[in-house]
Amino acid sequence: MKIYPVILSGGAGTRLWPLSRAVLPKQLLPLVADKTMLQETALRVSGLPGLMAPLVVCGNDHRFMVAEQLRAAGITPLGILLEPVGRNTAPAVAAAAHYLKSVDPEAVMLVLPADHVIENREAFKDAVLRAAEMVKGGGLATFGIVPKSPETGYGYIRRGAALAARDDCYQVERFVEKPDLATAQAFLADGGYYWNSGMFMFAAERYLAELAKFAPEIAAAADKAVNTGYRDLDFCRLDEAAFTACPSDSIDYAVMEHTQDAVVVPADIGWSDVGSWSALWEVQQHDENGNAKRGDVYLDGVKNSLVRAESRIVAVVGVEDIVVVETQDAVLVAHKDQVQRVKQVVDHLKSKERTEHLHHTRVYRPWGHYEGIDAGDRFQVKRITVKPGEKLSLQMHHHRAEHWVVVSGTARVTCGDKVSLLSENESTYIPIGMNHRLENPGKLPLHIIEVQSGSYLGEDDIVRFEDIYKRS
Protein backbone atom coordinates (compact mmCIF):
# COMPACT_ATOMS: atom_id res chain seq x y z
CA MET A 1 0.00 0.00 0.00
CA LYS A 2 1.35 3.40 -1.02
CA ILE A 3 0.06 6.31 1.05
CA TYR A 4 0.23 9.80 -0.45
CA PRO A 5 -0.03 12.73 1.97
CA VAL A 6 -2.37 15.39 0.57
CA ILE A 7 -1.62 18.67 2.32
CA LEU A 8 -4.41 21.25 2.11
CA SER A 9 -2.82 24.69 2.21
CA GLY A 10 -5.79 26.97 1.66
CA GLY A 11 -6.96 29.65 4.06
CA ALA A 12 -8.03 33.27 4.18
CA GLY A 13 -5.85 34.51 7.02
CA THR A 14 -8.50 36.10 9.26
CA ARG A 15 -8.45 34.41 12.67
CA LEU A 16 -4.82 35.22 13.49
CA TRP A 17 -4.80 38.80 12.23
CA PRO A 18 -2.67 40.95 12.25
CA LEU A 19 0.07 38.35 11.79
CA SER A 20 -1.93 36.29 9.32
CA ARG A 21 -3.13 38.09 6.18
CA ALA A 22 -4.86 37.06 2.95
CA VAL A 23 -1.58 36.78 1.02
CA LEU A 24 0.27 35.32 4.02
CA PRO A 25 -2.12 32.99 5.92
CA LYS A 26 -1.15 31.12 9.07
CA GLN A 27 0.09 27.95 7.37
CA LEU A 28 2.86 29.99 5.75
CA LEU A 29 3.96 31.53 9.07
CA PRO A 30 6.35 30.26 11.78
CA LEU A 31 3.79 30.48 14.56
CA VAL A 32 4.90 27.78 16.99
CA ALA A 33 8.42 26.86 15.87
CA ASP A 34 11.11 28.34 13.64
CA LYS A 35 9.65 26.56 10.62
CA THR A 36 6.30 27.46 9.10
CA MET A 37 3.26 25.31 9.76
CA LEU A 38 3.32 24.05 6.16
CA GLN A 39 6.94 23.01 6.57
CA GLU A 40 6.21 21.30 9.88
CA THR A 41 3.32 19.37 8.30
CA ALA A 42 5.41 18.25 5.32
CA LEU A 43 8.33 17.21 7.53
CA ARG A 44 5.99 15.34 9.89
CA VAL A 45 5.04 12.89 7.15
CA SER A 46 8.36 12.77 5.31
CA GLY A 47 9.87 10.17 7.63
CA LEU A 48 6.88 7.87 8.09
CA PRO A 49 7.19 4.37 6.57
CA GLY A 50 5.16 3.71 3.45
CA LEU A 51 4.41 7.37 2.81
CA MET A 52 5.23 8.88 -0.57
CA ALA A 53 6.12 12.47 -1.46
CA PRO A 54 3.28 14.86 -0.56
CA LEU A 55 0.79 16.42 -2.94
CA VAL A 56 0.02 20.00 -1.91
CA VAL A 57 -3.20 21.84 -2.78
CA CYS A 58 -3.05 25.62 -2.47
CA GLY A 59 -4.43 28.84 -3.91
CA ASN A 60 -2.90 30.49 -6.93
CA ASP A 61 -1.69 33.53 -4.97
CA HIS A 62 0.34 31.36 -2.58
CA ARG A 63 2.00 29.10 -5.14
CA PHE A 64 5.50 30.57 -5.14
CA MET A 65 5.70 30.82 -1.35
CA VAL A 66 4.49 27.22 -0.98
CA ALA A 67 7.09 26.00 -3.47
CA GLU A 68 9.87 28.02 -1.84
CA GLN A 69 9.00 26.87 1.68
CA LEU A 70 8.97 23.23 0.62
CA ARG A 71 12.33 23.69 -1.11
CA ALA A 72 13.79 25.35 2.00
CA ALA A 73 12.61 22.39 4.11
CA GLY A 74 14.23 19.89 1.74
CA ILE A 75 10.87 18.51 0.57
CA THR A 76 10.30 17.64 -3.09
CA PRO A 77 6.52 17.36 -3.54
CA LEU A 78 4.82 14.96 -5.88
CA GLY A 79 3.02 18.02 -7.21
CA ILE A 80 1.41 21.33 -6.30
CA LEU A 81 -2.23 21.67 -7.38
CA LEU A 82 -3.46 25.24 -7.80
CA GLU A 83 -7.06 26.09 -6.96
CA PRO A 84 -8.29 29.10 -8.97
CA VAL A 85 -10.90 29.72 -6.25
CA GLY A 86 -11.59 28.24 -2.84
CA ARG A 87 -14.33 25.59 -2.84
CA ASN A 88 -13.84 23.97 0.59
CA THR A 89 -12.33 20.56 1.23
CA ALA A 90 -14.51 18.12 -0.72
CA PRO A 91 -13.64 19.56 -4.18
CA ALA A 92 -9.99 20.12 -3.24
CA VAL A 93 -9.58 16.51 -2.15
CA ALA A 94 -11.54 15.28 -5.18
CA ALA A 95 -9.12 17.09 -7.47
CA ALA A 96 -6.21 15.59 -5.56
CA ALA A 97 -7.78 12.13 -5.84
CA HIS A 98 -8.14 12.41 -9.62
CA TYR A 99 -4.54 13.61 -9.87
CA LEU A 100 -3.27 10.73 -7.72
CA LYS A 101 -5.27 8.14 -9.67
CA SER A 102 -3.39 9.19 -12.81
CA VAL A 103 -0.13 8.51 -10.96
CA ASP A 104 -1.18 5.39 -9.05
CA PRO A 105 -4.64 3.83 -9.55
CA GLU A 106 -4.40 2.24 -6.08
CA ALA A 107 -3.27 5.40 -4.30
CA VAL A 108 -4.29 5.89 -0.67
CA MET A 109 -4.68 9.49 0.50
CA LEU A 110 -3.70 10.86 3.91
CA VAL A 111 -5.49 14.21 3.97
CA LEU A 112 -3.91 16.76 6.29
CA PRO A 113 -4.59 20.47 6.75
CA ALA A 114 -1.31 22.39 6.56
CA ASP A 115 -2.03 24.53 9.62
CA HIS A 116 -2.40 22.03 12.47
CA VAL A 117 -0.05 21.39 15.38
CA ILE A 118 0.72 17.77 16.29
CA GLU A 119 3.10 17.50 19.22
CA ASN A 120 3.33 13.71 19.63
CA ARG A 121 4.81 12.34 16.42
CA GLU A 122 5.01 8.74 17.62
CA ALA A 123 1.32 8.73 18.52
CA PHE A 124 0.56 10.31 15.13
CA LYS A 125 2.55 7.57 13.39
CA ASP A 126 0.59 4.93 15.32
CA ALA A 127 -2.73 6.54 14.34
CA VAL A 128 -1.70 6.60 10.67
CA LEU A 129 -0.79 2.90 10.77
CA ARG A 130 -4.12 2.02 12.40
CA ALA A 131 -6.00 4.07 9.81
CA ALA A 132 -4.14 2.26 7.04
CA GLU A 133 -5.50 -1.06 8.33
CA MET A 134 -9.04 0.33 8.18
CA VAL A 135 -8.51 1.57 4.63
CA LYS A 136 -7.37 -1.89 3.50
CA GLY A 137 -10.85 -3.11 4.37
CA GLY A 138 -12.52 -0.39 2.31
CA GLY A 139 -13.11 2.07 5.14
CA LEU A 140 -13.01 5.84 4.94
CA ALA A 141 -11.14 6.84 8.08
CA THR A 142 -11.37 10.09 9.99
CA PHE A 143 -9.03 10.88 12.87
CA GLY A 144 -10.92 11.68 16.07
CA ILE A 145 -8.94 13.64 18.64
CA VAL A 146 -9.29 12.40 22.22
CA PRO A 147 -10.75 15.49 23.95
CA LYS A 148 -8.97 17.08 26.89
CA SER A 149 -11.56 19.75 27.68
CA PRO A 150 -15.17 20.67 26.79
CA GLU A 151 -14.33 22.67 23.67
CA THR A 152 -17.15 24.51 21.91
CA GLY A 153 -15.08 25.51 18.89
CA TYR A 154 -14.80 22.03 17.37
CA GLY A 155 -17.26 19.64 15.80
CA TYR A 156 -17.47 16.20 17.42
CA ILE A 157 -17.62 12.60 16.23
CA ARG A 158 -19.75 10.08 18.13
CA ARG A 159 -18.22 6.63 17.93
CA GLY A 160 -20.30 3.54 17.29
CA ALA A 161 -19.40 -0.13 17.64
CA ALA A 162 -15.79 -1.26 17.77
CA LEU A 163 -14.54 -2.83 14.55
CA ALA A 164 -13.74 -6.50 14.28
CA ALA A 165 -10.37 -5.80 12.66
CA ARG A 166 -9.26 -3.57 15.55
CA ASP A 167 -11.09 -2.91 18.78
CA ASP A 168 -9.39 0.49 19.10
CA CYS A 169 -11.12 1.81 15.96
CA TYR A 170 -14.86 2.34 15.61
CA GLN A 171 -17.71 2.87 13.23
CA VAL A 172 -18.86 6.46 13.03
CA GLU A 173 -22.29 6.75 14.61
CA ARG A 174 -22.75 10.41 13.75
CA PHE A 175 -21.07 13.78 13.31
CA VAL A 176 -22.10 16.55 15.69
CA GLU A 177 -21.97 20.30 15.05
CA LYS A 178 -20.08 22.60 17.41
CA PRO A 179 -21.93 22.25 20.74
CA ASP A 180 -22.70 24.71 23.51
CA LEU A 181 -20.68 24.42 26.72
CA ALA A 182 -23.14 22.20 28.59
CA THR A 183 -23.32 19.76 25.68
CA ALA A 184 -19.53 19.75 25.30
CA GLN A 185 -19.19 18.95 29.01
CA ALA A 186 -21.62 16.05 28.58
CA PHE A 187 -19.62 14.78 25.58
CA LEU A 188 -16.41 14.88 27.62
CA ALA A 189 -18.00 12.97 30.51
CA ASP A 190 -19.50 10.40 28.13
CA GLY A 191 -16.12 9.32 26.78
CA GLY A 192 -17.51 8.24 23.42
CA TYR A 193 -16.99 11.52 21.57
CA TYR A 194 -13.94 12.86 19.76
CA TRP A 195 -13.00 16.22 18.33
CA ASN A 196 -13.35 16.31 14.56
CA SER A 197 -9.80 16.97 13.35
CA GLY A 198 -10.46 17.37 9.63
CA MET A 199 -7.80 14.72 8.90
CA PHE A 200 -8.71 11.66 6.82
CA MET A 201 -7.37 8.57 5.13
CA PHE A 202 -9.00 6.66 2.29
CA ALA A 203 -8.25 5.16 -1.10
CA ALA A 204 -8.58 7.76 -3.84
CA GLU A 205 -10.87 5.43 -5.80
CA ARG A 206 -13.14 4.84 -2.77
CA TYR A 207 -13.46 8.53 -2.02
CA LEU A 208 -14.35 9.35 -5.61
CA ALA A 209 -16.89 6.52 -5.74
CA GLU A 210 -18.64 7.75 -2.59
CA LEU A 211 -18.45 11.36 -3.79
CA ALA A 212 -20.07 10.40 -7.11
CA LYS A 213 -22.84 8.71 -5.12
CA PHE A 214 -23.59 11.52 -2.67
CA ALA A 215 -22.30 14.68 -4.41
CA PRO A 216 -22.13 13.92 -8.15
CA GLU A 217 -21.80 17.58 -9.19
CA ILE A 218 -18.62 17.94 -7.15
CA ALA A 219 -17.20 14.69 -8.51
CA ALA A 220 -17.88 15.67 -12.12
CA ALA A 221 -16.57 19.23 -11.77
CA ALA A 222 -13.37 18.10 -10.05
CA ASP A 223 -12.80 15.45 -12.72
CA LYS A 224 -13.16 18.04 -15.46
CA ALA A 225 -10.97 20.57 -13.62
CA VAL A 226 -8.10 18.08 -13.47
CA ASN A 227 -8.51 16.65 -16.97
CA THR A 228 -8.66 20.08 -18.62
CA GLY A 229 -6.04 21.61 -16.34
CA TYR A 230 -2.46 22.17 -17.45
CA ARG A 231 1.13 22.34 -16.27
CA ASP A 232 2.59 25.75 -15.44
CA LEU A 233 6.25 25.65 -14.43
CA ASP A 234 6.30 23.30 -11.41
CA PHE A 235 2.56 23.61 -10.80
CA CYS A 236 -0.61 21.92 -12.04
CA ARG A 237 -3.36 24.44 -12.66
CA LEU A 238 -6.93 23.22 -12.29
CA ASP A 239 -9.22 24.44 -15.04
CA GLU A 240 -10.68 27.71 -13.80
CA ALA A 241 -14.13 27.47 -15.37
CA ALA A 242 -14.71 23.87 -14.27
CA PHE A 243 -13.50 24.38 -10.71
CA THR A 244 -15.33 27.67 -10.27
CA ALA A 245 -18.56 25.93 -11.28
CA CYS A 246 -18.00 23.26 -8.61
CA PRO A 247 -20.29 23.45 -5.56
CA SER A 248 -18.54 24.33 -2.31
CA ASP A 249 -18.75 21.71 0.45
CA SER A 250 -16.70 19.98 3.12
CA ILE A 251 -15.67 16.32 3.11
CA ASP A 252 -17.84 15.74 6.18
CA TYR A 253 -21.02 17.10 4.61
CA ALA A 254 -20.41 15.76 1.11
CA VAL A 255 -19.28 12.22 1.97
CA MET A 256 -18.51 11.24 5.55
CA GLU A 257 -21.97 11.92 6.99
CA HIS A 258 -23.60 9.75 4.30
CA THR A 259 -21.26 6.83 3.66
CA GLN A 260 -21.81 3.52 5.45
CA ASP A 261 -18.06 2.94 5.60
CA ALA A 262 -16.93 5.83 7.81
CA VAL A 263 -14.64 4.77 10.65
CA VAL A 264 -13.07 6.87 13.39
CA VAL A 265 -9.49 6.31 14.51
CA PRO A 266 -9.01 7.77 18.01
CA ALA A 267 -5.85 9.87 18.18
CA ASP A 268 -4.24 11.28 21.32
CA ILE A 269 -1.51 13.17 19.47
CA GLY A 270 -1.19 16.60 21.07
CA TRP A 271 -3.34 18.18 18.36
CA SER A 272 -4.52 21.75 17.86
CA ASP A 273 -5.91 23.52 14.82
CA VAL A 274 -4.48 26.81 16.17
CA GLY A 275 -7.75 28.46 15.27
CA SER A 276 -7.31 31.54 17.47
CA TRP A 277 -4.73 33.49 19.43
CA SER A 278 -5.85 31.77 22.63
CA ALA A 279 -5.32 28.38 20.97
CA LEU A 280 -1.83 29.46 19.94
CA TRP A 281 -1.12 30.50 23.53
CA GLU A 282 -2.12 27.02 24.69
CA VAL A 283 0.40 25.21 22.45
CA GLN A 284 3.34 27.55 23.02
CA GLN A 285 5.91 27.30 25.78
CA HIS A 286 5.14 29.44 28.84
CA ASP A 287 7.38 31.24 31.29
CA GLU A 288 6.96 30.96 35.06
CA ASN A 289 3.98 33.35 34.91
CA GLY A 290 2.16 31.47 32.15
CA ASN A 291 3.17 33.91 29.42
CA ALA A 292 3.98 32.95 25.83
CA LYS A 293 6.23 35.56 24.25
CA ARG A 294 8.15 36.01 21.03
CA GLY A 295 10.32 38.85 19.78
CA ASP A 296 11.58 41.94 21.60
CA VAL A 297 9.20 41.83 24.57
CA TYR A 298 9.36 43.34 28.08
CA LEU A 299 6.86 42.05 30.66
CA ASP A 300 6.30 43.28 34.22
CA GLY A 301 3.52 41.85 36.37
CA VAL A 302 1.93 40.08 33.40
CA LYS A 303 0.31 36.65 33.71
CA ASN A 304 -1.23 34.06 31.36
CA SER A 305 -0.82 36.24 28.29
CA LEU A 306 0.49 36.01 24.74
CA VAL A 307 2.75 38.86 23.64
CA ARG A 308 4.40 38.87 20.22
CA ALA A 309 6.60 41.60 18.74
CA GLU A 310 7.57 41.51 15.07
CA SER A 311 9.32 44.83 14.42
CA ARG A 312 9.93 46.79 17.65
CA ILE A 313 10.01 46.48 21.41
CA VAL A 314 6.65 45.81 23.06
CA ALA A 315 6.31 46.52 26.80
CA VAL A 316 3.33 45.19 28.76
CA VAL A 317 2.79 45.96 32.44
CA GLY A 318 0.37 44.75 35.11
CA VAL A 319 -2.25 42.84 33.13
CA GLU A 320 -3.49 39.25 32.85
CA ASP A 321 -5.11 37.05 30.21
CA ILE A 322 -4.49 39.31 27.23
CA VAL A 323 -3.13 38.98 23.72
CA VAL A 324 -0.81 41.62 22.28
CA VAL A 325 0.42 41.15 18.72
CA GLU A 326 2.55 43.83 17.08
CA THR A 327 3.40 44.04 13.38
CA GLN A 328 4.90 46.82 11.26
CA ASP A 329 1.53 48.31 10.31
CA ALA A 330 -1.01 47.01 12.86
CA VAL A 331 -1.30 46.11 16.56
CA LEU A 332 -3.90 43.87 18.21
CA VAL A 333 -4.73 44.08 21.91
CA ALA A 334 -7.50 41.73 23.09
CA HIS A 335 -8.64 39.79 26.11
CA LYS A 336 -7.80 36.14 25.64
CA ASP A 337 -11.49 35.21 25.93
CA GLN A 338 -12.49 37.63 23.15
CA VAL A 339 -10.00 36.82 20.41
CA GLN A 340 -12.69 35.31 18.18
CA ARG A 341 -13.82 38.89 17.54
CA VAL A 342 -10.68 39.47 15.48
CA LYS A 343 -12.75 38.48 12.46
CA GLN A 344 -14.87 41.60 13.04
CA VAL A 345 -11.71 43.70 12.79
CA VAL A 346 -10.91 42.10 9.44
CA ASP A 347 -14.48 42.70 8.24
CA HIS A 348 -14.15 46.36 9.27
CA LEU A 349 -10.90 46.75 7.32
CA LYS A 350 -12.56 45.23 4.25
CA SER A 351 -15.57 47.53 4.53
CA LYS A 352 -13.28 50.56 4.69
CA GLU A 353 -11.29 49.29 1.68
CA ARG A 354 -8.08 49.27 3.69
CA THR A 355 -5.18 46.96 2.89
CA GLU A 356 -4.00 45.80 6.33
CA HIS A 357 -6.05 42.60 6.05
CA LEU A 358 -4.53 41.74 2.68
CA HIS A 359 -0.78 41.97 3.14
CA HIS A 360 2.02 43.15 5.39
CA THR A 361 4.32 46.05 4.59
CA ARG A 362 6.73 43.37 3.33
CA VAL A 363 5.25 41.63 0.28
CA TYR A 364 6.83 38.47 -1.09
CA ARG A 365 7.29 37.77 -4.78
CA PRO A 366 8.92 34.80 -6.55
CA TRP A 367 11.99 36.97 -7.28
CA GLY A 368 12.34 38.27 -3.69
CA HIS A 369 10.32 40.85 -1.77
CA TYR A 370 9.59 44.54 -1.37
CA GLU A 371 8.75 46.60 1.68
CA GLY A 372 6.92 49.91 1.90
CA ILE A 373 8.99 52.59 3.64
CA ASP A 374 7.00 55.78 3.09
CA ALA A 375 4.06 57.04 1.05
CA GLY A 376 2.27 60.32 0.48
CA ASP A 377 0.50 62.40 -2.14
CA ARG A 378 1.84 61.28 -5.55
CA PHE A 379 4.87 59.42 -4.16
CA GLN A 380 5.81 56.07 -2.64
CA VAL A 381 9.13 54.68 -1.38
CA LYS A 382 9.99 50.98 -1.32
CA ARG A 383 12.94 48.82 -0.32
CA ILE A 384 13.31 46.05 -2.93
CA THR A 385 15.34 42.86 -2.50
CA VAL A 386 16.03 40.62 -5.51
CA LYS A 387 17.41 37.13 -4.94
CA PRO A 388 20.61 36.12 -6.78
CA GLY A 389 19.95 35.12 -10.37
CA GLU A 390 16.33 36.30 -10.33
CA LYS A 391 14.64 38.96 -12.43
CA LEU A 392 11.43 40.96 -12.40
CA SER A 393 9.14 40.95 -15.43
CA LEU A 394 9.74 43.17 -18.44
CA GLN A 395 7.04 45.75 -17.74
CA MET A 396 5.77 49.29 -17.99
CA HIS A 397 3.50 51.62 -16.03
CA HIS A 398 0.94 54.07 -17.39
CA HIS A 399 0.80 56.43 -14.42
CA ARG A 400 4.11 56.44 -12.58
CA ALA A 401 7.83 57.00 -13.04
CA GLU A 402 10.46 55.28 -10.91
CA HIS A 403 13.87 56.19 -9.51
CA TRP A 404 16.15 53.33 -8.44
CA VAL A 405 19.18 53.61 -6.15
CA VAL A 406 21.37 50.55 -5.59
CA VAL A 407 22.13 50.07 -1.89
CA SER A 408 24.13 46.85 -2.25
CA GLY A 409 24.73 44.25 -4.92
CA THR A 410 24.73 44.58 -8.69
CA ALA A 411 21.69 45.44 -10.81
CA ARG A 412 21.19 44.77 -14.49
CA VAL A 413 18.68 47.37 -15.67
CA THR A 414 16.75 47.31 -18.93
CA CYS A 415 15.23 50.69 -19.83
CA GLY A 416 13.82 50.83 -23.33
CA ASP A 417 16.55 49.56 -25.67
CA LYS A 418 19.34 50.26 -23.19
CA VAL A 419 20.80 47.63 -20.83
CA SER A 420 23.22 48.76 -18.11
CA LEU A 421 24.89 47.50 -14.94
CA LEU A 422 24.58 49.51 -11.74
CA SER A 423 26.67 49.07 -8.61
CA GLU A 424 26.39 50.35 -5.04
CA ASN A 425 25.41 54.05 -4.77
CA GLU A 426 24.55 54.29 -8.49
CA SER A 427 21.05 55.18 -9.69
CA THR A 428 18.77 55.30 -12.70
CA TYR A 429 15.44 56.80 -13.80
CA ILE A 430 12.53 54.95 -15.44
CA PRO A 431 10.12 57.36 -17.23
CA ILE A 432 6.36 56.83 -17.39
CA GLY A 433 5.43 54.41 -20.17
CA MET A 434 8.96 53.04 -20.63
CA ASN A 435 9.56 49.29 -20.90
CA HIS A 436 11.91 48.25 -18.09
CA ARG A 437 13.25 45.32 -16.11
CA LEU A 438 15.36 44.81 -12.98
CA GLU A 439 17.65 41.77 -12.65
CA ASN A 440 20.21 40.49 -10.16
CA PRO A 441 23.07 38.87 -12.11
CA GLY A 442 25.22 38.50 -8.99
CA LYS A 443 25.68 35.89 -6.27
CA LEU A 444 24.53 38.13 -3.41
CA PRO A 445 21.08 39.66 -2.80
CA LEU A 446 20.43 42.94 -4.59
CA HIS A 447 19.00 45.74 -2.43
CA ILE A 448 17.62 48.89 -4.01
CA ILE A 449 15.52 51.85 -2.93
CA GLU A 450 12.70 52.67 -5.34
CA VAL A 451 10.97 56.05 -5.35
CA GLN A 452 7.72 56.06 -7.34
CA SER A 453 6.02 59.28 -8.41
CA GLY A 454 2.87 59.84 -10.41
CA SER A 455 -0.88 60.25 -10.39
CA TYR A 456 -1.63 56.60 -9.52
CA LEU A 457 0.68 54.23 -7.61
CA GLY A 458 -1.40 51.05 -7.29
CA GLU A 459 0.17 47.64 -7.87
CA ASP A 460 -2.35 46.99 -10.65
CA ASP A 461 -0.76 49.68 -12.85
CA ILE A 462 1.50 47.21 -14.58
CA VAL A 463 1.68 45.79 -18.10
CA ARG A 464 3.90 42.71 -18.36
CA PHE A 465 5.51 41.90 -21.70
CA GLU A 466 7.67 39.00 -20.54
CA ASP A 467 7.78 37.12 -17.25
CA ILE A 468 9.74 33.98 -16.38
CA TYR A 469 7.12 33.18 -13.72
CA LYS A 470 4.27 33.36 -16.27
CA ARG A 471 2.26 35.93 -14.33
CA SER A 472 -0.35 37.89 -16.26
Annotate each PLM feature.
Residues 448:
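Noncatalytic nucleic-acid binding interfaces
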Residues 1-3, 51-52, 75-77, 104-107, ...:
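Short coil/turn connectors at secondary-structure junctions
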Residues 120-245, 263:
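Conserved core of the sugar-phosphate nucleotidyltransferase
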Residues 1-2, 205-405, 410-429, 436, ...:
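Left-handed beta-helix
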Residues 109, 173, 192, 199-200, ...:
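A residue-level structural signature of the nucleotidyltransferase/glycosyltransferase Rossmann-like core
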Residues 1-7, 14-25, 30-113, 117-123, ...:
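Conserved N-terminal catalytic core of the sugar/cofactor nucleotidyltransferase
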Residues 86-91, 149-151, 181-183, 271-272, ...:
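A short acidic, often aromatic-flanked loop/helix-cap motif at beta-alpha or helix-coil junctions
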Residues 10, 59-60, 84, 112-114, ...:
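Fold-independent oxyanion-binding glycine-rich loops
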